[in-house]
Each structure stands twice: as structure tokens, then as C-alpha cells.
Amino acid sequence: MSDPKFIHLRIHSDFSMVDGLSKVPPLVKKVAAMGMPAMALTDFTNLCGLVKFYSTAHNCGVKPIIGADFTLQSEEFGDELTKLTLLAKNNVGYKNLTLLISKAYLRGHVQHQPVIDKAWLVEHAEGLIVLSGGKSGEVGRALLKGNQQQVERCIEFYQTHFADHFYLELIRTGRADEESYLHFALDVAEQYDLPVVATNEVVFITEESFEAHEIRVAIHDGYTLEDPRRPKNYSPKQYLRSEAEMCELFADIPEALANSVEIAKRCNVTVRLGEYFLPNFPTGGMAIEDFLVMKSREGLEERLEFLFPDPEVRAKRRPEYDERLQVELDVINQMGFPGYFLIVMEFIQWSKDNDIPVGPGRGSGAGSLVAYALKITDLDPLEYDLLFERFLNPERVSMPDFDVDFCMDKRDQVIDHVAEMYGRDAVSQIITFGTMAAKAVIRDVGRVLGHPFGFVDRISKLVPPDPGMTLEKAFIAEPALQELYDADEEVKELIDKCRILEGCTRNAGKHAGGVVISPTAITDFAPIYCDAEGNFPVTQFDKNDVETAGLVKFDFLGLRTLTIIDWALGLVNPRLKKAGKPPVRIEAIPLDDARSFRNLQDAKTTAVFQLESRGMKELIKRLQPDCFEDIIALVALFRPGPLQSGMVDNFIDRKHGREAISYPDEKWQHESLKEILEPTYGIILYQEQVMQIAQVLSGYTLGGADMLRRAMGKKKPEEMAKQRAVFQEGAEKNGVDGELAMKIFDLVEKFAGYGFNKSHSAAYALVSYQTLWLKTHYPAEFMAAVMTADMDNTEKVVGLVDECKNMGLTVLPPDINSGLYRFNVDDNGAIVYGIGAIKGVGEGPIEAILEARNKGGYFKDLFDFCARIDLKKVNKRVIEKLILAGALDRLGPHRAAMMASVDDAVRAASQHHQAEAFGQADMFGVLTDAPEEVEQKYTQVPEWPEKVRLEGERETLGLYLTGHPVDEYLKELTKYTSCRLNEAAPTRRDQSLTVAGLVIAARVMTTKRGTRIGLMTLDDRSGRMEVMLYSEALDRYAEWLEKDKILVVSGQVSFDDFNGGLKMSAREVMDLGSAREKFARGLSISILQSQIDQQFFERFSHILEPHRAGTVPVNVYYQRPDARARLTLGTEWRVTPSDTLLDELKQLLGHDQVELEFN
């Protein structure tokens, strides 16, 4: 290959996030395909793509040049920011580049972008080559302004600090001022003997990608393409030009080309990838391996005393634990990971010592006895046949990876502790990148192209909302999208542009749980990224790249369920302490509690971790789990693979004796597999069983068996052929028939695809069981904790309040005197609604209220409440929300009176606060001790009707708490219905049942065949029922399919096999008005003689008038002390008896004097 004539030294990938269109690997591969031996990646103030760039470049035979584009601020230019590019000449330069990037984010945000200070440039100059930034750099700006003195000062700075490492950059991409700058620059270069270099400031691969890049920039900047104000900073010529094109472009300045090659030769950085660097763990001078052994043995002793309190039993069981511990310790120490285990041990122990709940384990880590001994996990791996080699395989070197669950509320405290222990500059969270996803990219590109919202919305709604959805998958999943694409040229154009942009890096954020702990400063391994305020620093390498770069990742995950358990125990244990009883230790509860398993078998698992979905409840009812092993199996079985393969049916039938148990198949089984498969009734359910079968039958080591399990998962034909031979040979050596061995191998291979990690299943089954146990033994406290965790999700709270009622628990409205921010439990065992769940109140006002209550005791009334709180924090709107929610019910006569008195109470309180602030002088100038108490006088107004009161609760709480909209109609509904919902029973096909209730959920769904079905849930306070409306019924009654309506529905009732309970197929649907017209014989109105005055009949006819032309006769009963007469109004006065009519008549005459008459 001949010597290169040009090398690209300024290329952006999509990691530049503002500009740059291409992913790093395709970019590098294109450079290699063009025959270029080197390239520089210079993303804007970041090295996010470095690991991918360095690895891909080496694999493609391209020399990677590491650099970045920067924005620079200096006294010379004041508020005007300039550009420059820095390339790492050597490893010192690479470190300085990393430090400059980190400083720009941590300390240098100006005008919403990371910026470096010129003084930092001097401090970190060693090993860096500077490209001047072309017309946007300091020299370029000064030249274009014609400021010769500024030009001289700038050149003097770079010649002083960068000597022969500063190049004037020349760019020819057809943008404004480029040629003017270029001529000036060449003159200056000659005058000051400065080298020049040609670049193309590449932001996309091909010229055709220009429009897509313009769209990307417009999305970021918030413009449409046609907006005349849109800045046009880019050119179609900023593509990856070939060497020949660049040579032709700069044929008149050959030294600019030659210098690009010269710079490429000067840049030689070696990045160490694929090694691991752990921080030093303090061991008090002991060898770290010995320290791990000591801690593990001490911990195992404690565990054995807990597991086997009887010394004789303990002595008998000890050898197998000691042997397993030694095997694991040998592997951990040989592989060089003792520090990893000790680091995890320390922060978990610190968490437990500081009352921060920690999960019992997660993933394959629960298979380690060392982890159990060090209290990293809380499940005995020998008891449940969990394998260490599934976690750490001595035959496949990779870092161990403990995922640790912490209470959501306190997880950040643990990260803060780790930063304190190892040094804040050595601990960081990890970056994660948001990309342009299928649905969002359609909306963004559509907006930028100026399409109407409706047009774009129609297309984006055809993309399913599933996680990981791509345009390619969407075309397969939704045929209508393909039809639209083929039929409409505008749609095709939009989608084609979206395809180019889909998957582009859009923004950076913080990974959910990843934390790295470095042996030295993080910046020795990766640059830092953070927000515009310099907060939340994260590594610029993502979770995979940061490990490749040598840093060890620890996953600090937040698990909401641990928070719920913690809150529940926070309610339970103080009460137990008060009663002189020992506290509940959740890690010590028995795993065979009969009451808990009875609730489980009845599928009373709403709010129980992992076991609360409809499908899971159905599986529980079929399986009837009666031991902890069955809960482990439940977690593993409830996945698409086992459910679709028939494995679940076999498992259930074998458990209940409907199918013979074989190990694993009645035709092909072996006695040695019985012990492995007995807990799962002969079904190969877990990955660990796959490994054990290979070990027992064919003599695999467990490390080798783990490799087999992985190979089976990947299904590579050559690898599988190799493994089959090894399996058969090993089996025959063990005296197993070769044909039988191959049949078992086939069965193992089949089920390996569905196999689940038992360690993870067991650890999470333990959390499931703990929540089940709490729900069983401390139901009020548990449900209060669950509702607190979900208080921001009104829909969920509504369902949980219903579950409380099903459990026989009382849920009281929020109460300003006995309530807390969270849901809590009063002395009578009733759940008090959390004040924090009231919509529109917020944490600040509640804190202020609780502070006033703690300081001065319970509030006496509304006036006392307003006088004692800080009205700047708790304003009138908040007080009104509290009244509507019922939180002030104990402070006044009724909600209507308090709402009418709010203004007076706030005014009086303001005067009271002013008097407090200035002091009160009496007429003789003597200061009194305190202002007078606020006078309490409620505005006299009638109490709200129940409907208004309940609507206030629904507005603020999201549900009806002190009543139900159905209540006032219960007597009337008996005239239309066959029974209440809780009395309904299945009917024959030719029979109908009529029920009524409030619609609490309604939707229309489309089946896979394209059929539309209406679904609604009726609630009459006695129970609920799912109602289906098929084809004709849906067409006829679609308008009634609306939430919060009271409907009367007739149809066939049957068992709901999927959800349990009953369901109805609707034949007729009526709202209350229609039902009244159909069933009511008349509207009875009683008028007393004393009620009649001169205006009475005018008011009476005024109320009836809007409701005439109905079908129900009006029967007026006139009553005086000595006689009663009935008068039926003429047919022209027949009415439609709506709620409005009935309410207005009741207000005029009285509640008991208006009612519907039925046969």
C-alpha cells in the first residue's frame, strides 16, 4: 500500500449529540473500506465513543487518533466563545484530554454548553496537538474581524504554549467566510511560519445524508426545516470525502494535506482495554486473600448457628458447607477477585447497620456460599441447589457481577457512603444514552418537516408502544403501517428519513444502578459528564465500555418492594414494642407459614411482589403451591417460553398426580437424575438443572457444564455438534447407554432454551414470600405501605382501596389531626389515608402542617388551623383541596360550611399573623402578651348533596371514599335488576340476567382477527363484573361505553376462566334515563298545602318545562291536613325523569316528596 496523502483529523459521530449522524463502527468501517490507514474521532467535548472507536479501529486495521472538539472562553474574546480541536499525541496527552473534558462539564458550563478556560489549556498542554478551529477559532475570528493585534496575541499564546504542536486549520466545505478566512490564514501562516492542515469537519458519511443531518440539528434546536430563522451552520460537503477528493480540493496547498499525515504519525496513544482494576480494600495489613478466607469462615459460623441451632445437627451438616466454602474461596482467590467480594460485603453491611433495607440477592450471585457467609445474599445455596459456577466460572474468565437491590428511598445514601470511603473523585455513576426511538423519531421528524399534527400522530400511533420497538419490527407487527407506506408518498418520504435517524444518540443520562469504584481518580480511566449545573457526574463510557476500560461496575439497584417492606415494618414494630412483644425480623420469618400458603392458594396476592398479575393468579390457582420451592418454580414458570411450550401444564399435572413423574421423560430417563429433578417433578425448569445433569450423567465439571448451558442458549450448530460428542463420550465412560445419553441430551437442549436462573428465581421468590407473609399477618400495615409507594398513581390506589375492602380493612379519609404524609394505621387497626396522596397539595405544604401540629397539638377548627399554619406555604387553594378530600372533616360542621368560610378564616389568620409580627399595644401603649385568638364563625350554608361531596373526593383522591355514586340509586336499581353483582350466578345461553352499576373502566380493543370488542367493568359496591360488548351490541351501545356512567345491563353470565369470577356478554345496555322511561309507571310528586304560595306554580312549571316530551306521566298528590287528592298531569306534561329533574324537584319540595313509581 502506498503512503497516504491525506488523513481525516476531524470527524463527529452521533455521540456529538448536537451534530454528527453516524454510529462509530460503520464510520470506522467506511474509513477502512476507503483505504485510509488512520482517522481521528473528535466528538464535541466528549470521548463517549472512544472504546468502540479504539476497538473497531484496531479490528479494521485503522490507526485510531483520539481527540475532541472544544468550545473555548478567554479574556481576549470576552463573552464570545471560540472553537478548537485537541488531539492526543501520546498517553500524557490522552490523560490531559480526559481532564479537560471533565473540567468542562464539572466547572465550565457557559451559555448552556461545556466550555474550557484558556488557563486550563495551559495547565494541561503537555502531549496535546491543537488544530486552530478554522474560521470559528480564536485566530479565525480575529482574522475575519481584521484585528491584527488580536491575531498576534493569539498566535503568540499558541506558539508559547504549544510550540510545534499548533496548526492553522483550513476547511473548504462551501460555507460563508471560509475562503476569506483561508486566504488570511495562509498569509499569517507564512508571516509567522505556522504549519497549516486540511480538515473536512465531517459530520456524516455520504453527501446524500445532508438533509437527514439538517433534520437532526433542527430537532435539537427546535426549528422546522422551512423556518427562515433557522441557523444554517452545515454544508452538504461535510461528508467523509475520499483521499482523492481531498487531494483535488487542496491541490493548491499540498502542505495542508501532508501535515494531516504528519499529525497522524505523531499521534500514538495506547489505551489498555480488557483489564480489571479494583480499589484497595482495607485489611489491616493482612493479605487480601487471607482476609476473605477469615471473613467467610466467621460468617459461615454465624449462618450455621442460625440454620442449625441444634449442635449435633450442625456438626453433621458442617462438612458439606466447609467443603463448598473452600472450593469457592479457591476459585475466587485464584481468579483475583477477593477484593470484589469484600467491597460488596462492606457496603451491604454498612447499609444493614444504617437501617437501609437490602435485598436477599439477585441474579446468579445467590448461588455463592461465600456471598451467603459474607451476608451479601440471604438464601442458603445448598438448601436450594444453587450453583456457584453459574455465577463465577473458573473456566471462563469474566468479572463477577453482584446486582444488589436497595430500598428505593435510601439507595443514594449507600452510593454516598461508597464515595466517602473510596474518595469522591474515585466513585461515579455511569452514563446511559437516549436514542431516537421509532415512535418518537416519527413525531420529531414530522414536526421538523412541517407536517400537520394529525398526519404525524396517525402514523406514530401505528407503531406499537412495546419496549425496544423499531420501525422494522413495527412494519411486521402492524400491516396497516406497510399499507400506508405503500399508498402515500408523503408517508414514505417521512418514514425513509426516520429510518436514517432512528437509533441516533439523542441525549445522555444516568444509568439506573451502575456505579464504578476506581483505584485512583475516575478520570485516569474515563472522562466525566454531568448536567449544566455540574451535578450528577457520570462516566462518559457506558456500562459495557466502562468495564472494557478497566473499571469494575457495581449495580446499586432500587427495588420498590424493599421500601414497602421497610415502611410496613416501620408501622408494625413500634406497635409490637408498645405491647412488649419482640419485633418482626423479616429475614427470620418461617418459610412454611400455613396461613400465608392458604392465602397464596386462594390467589389473594394483590400487591404481593411478582404474584399479583391476573395471569399469575390464574397460574397460582392451577398450581396450588404449598411450599417455598413451589414459589421459586412459579417465578420461573410464569414466562412466555414455559407457558407456550406446554411445560407449565406438565408441571401442574405432575404435581397433582394427573401425569406420571419421570426423570425427565417416561421413555428416556435415568435414575441418577431423580435427585436433580425431584423438586420440579421431573421437569427441567432451571439452568442449574441443565448443568447438574451434564455433571452427573457425563462427568462435566460445573464450569464446563456452564459453558454447555451457554452453548445451548446460543444454538450454534458447530459448537452443539462438539458438545454432543463430549456429552456422549462422558456418559458412556460413566456406564450410561450412548443412545439414552443422546435422547436425554436432546431433551436437555430443548428445555435449556426455556430454563431460568434458579438463583435469581429463589432470591426473588423470597421477597415475594416476605410480602405475602406481611399481607397475611399484618394486612393493614402492609397495605398502608403499598398505597404509600403508589400514592402518585391514582389508578393503583383506587384498586388497592378496593382490595382493602375485600380484605375487611377500614380505610379512613385523610385527617389533618391523625394523618401523616404517608398512609398509616390508627390504634383501631384502620388505615388512615395519606395526606400526601391528595392531589394538588404537595410535600411542602404537608410538612408545614405537620410542623404546626407537632408544635401546638391538634387543630381545634378551621380558624385555628389557618391561624397556626404558614399561609405562604399552605395557600387557600391547598386548604380547599384538603376540605374537598375530607382531611378537615373534624374541624367544622361540614365541608360546605368550611369551603364557604375559607376566605374569612384566611383573612382572620393573616390579621392574626400580622399582629404576632408587630406585637399588639393596648390604648395605654402597653404590649400585650399575645394577639387575641381568631374568632371562629362559620358561614351558614346547607350541607352538600352526597353527589357533590363524592365528586370532591374523586377530584382530590381519585376515588370515592365515604360513599359511592351508586348508593343513592340502590333502591331504584332493584326495580330494574335481577340481583346485586355479588349475587350473580352463571346463566344458560338462552337466559339473561340484568345487573346495574357504575362503569369504573371502559375501553374498546381490537383482536388479532381485527374484531372490535367493548370491555367495561361495572361496580355496584357489592362487587364487580367484567362486561363484554360484541359486534352488534358494541355498534348499538358504543355511546354508553363511558367511565363514571351508571348503566343497567342485561346479558348472559358465565365464569371468567382467565380472571376468576364472572363475566357478562351484554345484549342490552341502558343508562338510568332509558331504564326509567322503560320501567317507571309514573313520577310521584307530593305537594303540601303549606308549600303553595303565589310563585309556587310558576317555579314548579319552570322546573318541569325542560324535561317535557318524555314518556313518564306526572302524578301530583296534593295534601292538606284534612284531605289528600291525586292529579295526573296531561300527556303534554309527560317527562323524561333525569337526575337533574329529580334533584330540582327535591330541592323545591323535599327529598321524601319526589319518587318514581313502579308496577
From Swiss-Prot:
Q: What does this protein do?
A: DNA polymerase III is a complex, multichain enzyme responsible for most of the replicative synthesis in bacteria. This DNA polymerase also exhibits 3' to 5' exonuclease activity. The alpha chain is the DNA polymerase.
* Annotated EC: 2.7.7.7
Similarity comment text for this entry: Belongs to the DNA polymerase type-C family. DnaE subfamily.
Q: Quote the subcellular location field of this record.
A: Cytoplasm
Query: Do you know which SMART domains this protein is assigned to?
Result: POLIIIAc
**Assigned GO CC terms:** cytoplasm
Entry keyword Nucleotidyltransferase: yes
Mention one GO biological process in which this protein takes part, according to its record. DNA replication
UniProt KW keywords: Cytoplasm, DNA replication, DNA-directed DNA polymerase, Nucleotidyltransferase, Transferase
Subunit structure, interactors included: DNA polymerase III contains a core (composed of alpha, epsilon and theta chains) that associates with a tau subunit. This core dimerizes to form the PolIII' complex. PolIII' associates with the gamma complex (composed of gamma, delta, delta', psi and chi chains) and with the beta chain to form the complete DNA polymerase III complex.
The record's top EC class is transferase
* Descriptive protein name: DNA polymerase III subunit alpha
Keyword Cytoplasm in annotation: yes
UniProt catalytic activity: DNA(n) + a 2'-deoxyribonucleoside 5'-triphosphate = DNA(n+1) + diphosphate
Name of the coding gene: dnaE
Please name the source species.
Answer: Vibrio cholerae serotype O1 (strain ATCC 39315 / El Tor Inaba N16961)
Single GO molecular-function term? nucleic acid binding
